[in-house]
Swiss-Prot record:
It comes from the Viruses. This is Hemagglutinin. Belongs to the influenza viruses hemagglutinin family. It comes from Influenza B virus (strain B/Fukuoka/80/1981). Keywords: Disulfide bond, Fusion of virus membrane with host endosomal membrane, Fusion of virus membrane with host membrane, Glycoprotein, Hemagglutinin, Host cell membrane, Host membrane, Host-virus interaction, Lipoprotein, Membrane, Palmitate, Transmembrane, Viral attachment to host cell, Viral envelope protein, Viral penetration into host cytoplasm, Virion, Virus entry into host cell. Pfam families: Hemagglutinin. The lineage of its organism: Viruses, Riboviria, Orthornavirae, Negarnaviricota, Polyploviricotina. Glycans are attached at N25, N59, N145, N164, N231, N302, N331. The gene is HA.
Amino acid sequence: DLICTGITSSNSPHVVKTATQGEVNVTGVIPLTTTPTKSHFANLKGTKTRGKLCPNCLNCTDLDVALGRPKCMGTIPSAKASILHEVKPVTSGCFPIMHDRTKIRQLPNLLRGYENIRLSTRNVINAEWAPGGPYKIGTSGSCPNVTNGNGFFATMAWAVPKDNKTATDPLTVEVPYICTKGEDQITVWGFHSDNEAQMVKLYGDSKPQKFTSSANGVTTHYVSQIGGFPNQTEDGGIPQSGRIVVDYMVQKPGKTGTIVYQRGVLLPQKVWCASGRSKVIKGSLPLIGEADCLHEKYGGLNKSKPYYTGEHAKAIGNCPIWVKTPLKLANGTKYRPPAKLLKER
């Protein structure tokens, strides 16, 4: 922290703070900080950046994609960085879901955190012959498929008893690990409930049903709610008096999960296989151009200085470091006033 003294006859507008001498006037400085201005978000230079989970799935929310809504099936590109762009709670445009009863809205965020995400090509269990069956796999007019016929989510099978429409004690199904590359397996499941008349018609039991899932040391319990739902439609579909509750469990490589259920279960089918890590940051779409850094408050930044002032928030990439006050590097000498000539005596 040594500033060499020199002599200059010019004024010195530059002041730097030093550790040993406090504020010191110097003949020159190099600014080390910048104050960014807000900009659009961009692709992170040198890496793949993910905006929507499925860029080619038109008119689909990320929750639609995560649940396998029939018209929202597509490839999720790999990415080292992901934009959390759906800042408000979103719904799925299929069968009405009771979103607030589980953590299901977190599913798209969970998937964003992985670099590689793919949907399994086969079903994790044979739902038609699961315990308590045989079952007819239910579909809904509120969830049209690509040919506009009745459909349902690819990640779940709506298990409606074929002939044995009676109450049942809790049943257990094991959910095997079927991913093939050592990935995390994200298994989606749930249950359906309706008013008493519909519950008797579909399942032969109008009482609340009990459900439990267990995987990776995490166990979750639910009891279904019977009736009391107004007719509701999602995305222009057929109004429904029933509701579904949807949850998920994460299975580590080689680990089996279990689901204990009664009537109305939505058994897991296609599962997500996910690996690697993708850094996630809140932002907005579309992504325009490229940037050195993605900042939650300022968007895409190109690094022109090593430090910045302004709003402090999460940032990813080659980013400047946040500081409270501007920093300067002295590249001149300590300023000294011009010497005064002695008067002749």
